[in-house]
């Protein structure tokens, strides 16, 4: 499917199509691109889909997008064999997993402290919009030519976006640590606030690729000594997180807070400071995730990151971190992120619709929590003892 999409995009560009938009992933990504065209007042000449799930979106276009009435529909030739177990599909899965995996590092730390952060998806969308808007405004201030903007403009915009997301994470952590408000309530409220701010940025309109410098896409698509930037960032952050969690006293403090907060406090652990730290880190990494996602599609939309918190939490719990706090490993989270990514890829190839995919991920979270709870109460040990033969 992705090979078809990329090949078709290249062919249309060589035929002189001035504006080709590529939507890869779940059907909701196709709706995002349609929203971009609508917001920018552009016309829809042709639309391509690689499966029935995308066709459902296309059938609804005349009703939901009255401005798009006449357009061609292109479909691929029937596949002779599955492309699921191919190197290209693995690369595509890795590309999509990077944002989930990086954001999940911060979520792992939060959950180990027996907390939760429901705002990460909205922070991804917020930081994507803020970063792209800042860069667009700098381009306008410099004369309005995106081609004349340098890398400093791009990376200063990314830095502003990450810093803003980190400050929001700091705010969430302060409410949890010092005001003793339940993490679920705090981050639910922050989720709504951040989504509202994302929708207000740039007047609620998409920041399109025509308004951004060419260097904007380099963060996600560029390479470092031959290694894709996304892979380099993934390896760097996971190694750093592993060392921090397993080799430093602050990592041990995080586990102590989640294991028994009162005991940790009596032992001299700065509980409030640790809670503040993990929520701030989670916000910063969500900000980086938003920059990576915007760079991947070379644009920023107000709906970016919608539902991402579900995938991030699923990656953490599938990776073995207990939602009840006190245990978990960052490399387990990385494995969990790839499991979720592979499942998403498989469901896309099987043409599962977005609601079905969300139901599957929700079920995975519930099952993982139930299994963890069974482990905590010693259910497996009791079952093994009951099933073992009694001594004569």
Task: Annotate each predicted stretch with a short phrase.
Residues 63, 266, 270-273, 347-392:
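Cytosolic-side transmembrane-helix boundaries in multi-pass membrane proteins
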Residues 86-138, 174-181, 320-330, 363:
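Single transmembrane alpha-helix segments in multi-pass membrane proteins
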Residues 110-127, 175-189, 253, 300-310, ...:
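Short, non-helical or kinked segments that cap or interrupt transmembrane helices
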Residues 141-190, 335-336:
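Alpha-helical transmembrane segments within multi-pass membrane transporters and channels
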Residues 155, 184-248, 274-277, 296-304, ...:
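Transmembrane helix-bundle core of multi-pass membrane transporters
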Residues 240-280:
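Membrane-helix/interface signature in polytopic inner-membrane proteins
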């Amino acid at each position: 499917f992705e090979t078809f999409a990329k090949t078709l995009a290249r062919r249309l560009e060589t035929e002189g199509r001035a504006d080709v938009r590529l939507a890869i992933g779940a059907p909701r990504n196709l709706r995002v691109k349609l929203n971009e065209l609508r917001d920018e007042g552009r016309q829809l000449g042709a639309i391509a889909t690689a499966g029935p799930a995308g066709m459902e979106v296309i059938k609804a276009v005349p009703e939901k997008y009255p401005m798009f009435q006449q357009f061609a529909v292109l479909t691929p030739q029937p596949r002779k064999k599955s492309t699921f177990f191919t190197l290209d599909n693995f690369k595509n899965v890795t590309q999509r997993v990077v944002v989930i995996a990086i954001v999940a590092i911060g979520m792992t730390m939060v959950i180990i402290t027996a907390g939760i952060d429901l705002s990460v998806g909205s922070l991804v969308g917020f930081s994507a919009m803020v970063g792209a808007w800042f860069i667009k405004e700098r381009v306008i201030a410099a004369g309005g030519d995106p081609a004349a903007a340098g890398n400093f403009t791009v990376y200063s915009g990314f830095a502003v976006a990450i810093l803003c997301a980190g400050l929001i994470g700091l705010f969430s952590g302060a409410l949890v640590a010092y005001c003793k408000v339940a993490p679920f309530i705090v981050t639910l409220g922050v989720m709504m606030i951040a989504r509202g701010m994302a929708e207000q940025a740039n007047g609620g309109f998409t920041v399109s690729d025509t308004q951004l410098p060419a260097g904007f896409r380099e963060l996600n698509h560029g390479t470092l000594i031959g290694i894709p930037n996304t892979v380099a960032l993934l390896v760097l952050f996971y190694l750093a997180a592993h060392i921090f969690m397993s080799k430093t006293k602050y990592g041990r403090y995080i586990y102590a807070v989640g294991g028994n907060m009162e005991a940790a406090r009596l032992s001299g652990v700065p509980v409030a400071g640790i809670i503040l730290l993990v929520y701030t880190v989670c916000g910063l990494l969500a900000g980086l995730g938003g920059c990576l996602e915007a760079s991947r599609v070379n644009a920023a939309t107000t709906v970016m990151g919608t539902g991402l918190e579900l995938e991030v939490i699923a990656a953490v719990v599938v990776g073995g971190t207990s939602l009840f706090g006190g245990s978990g490993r960052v490399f387990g989270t990385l494995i969990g992120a790839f499991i979720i990514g592979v499942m998403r890829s498989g469901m896309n190839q099987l043409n599962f619709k977005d609601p079905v995919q969300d139901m599957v991920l929700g079920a995975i979270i519930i099952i993982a929590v139930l299994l963890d709870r069974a482990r905590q109460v010693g259910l497996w040990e009791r079952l093994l003892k009951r099933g073992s033969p009694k001594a004569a």
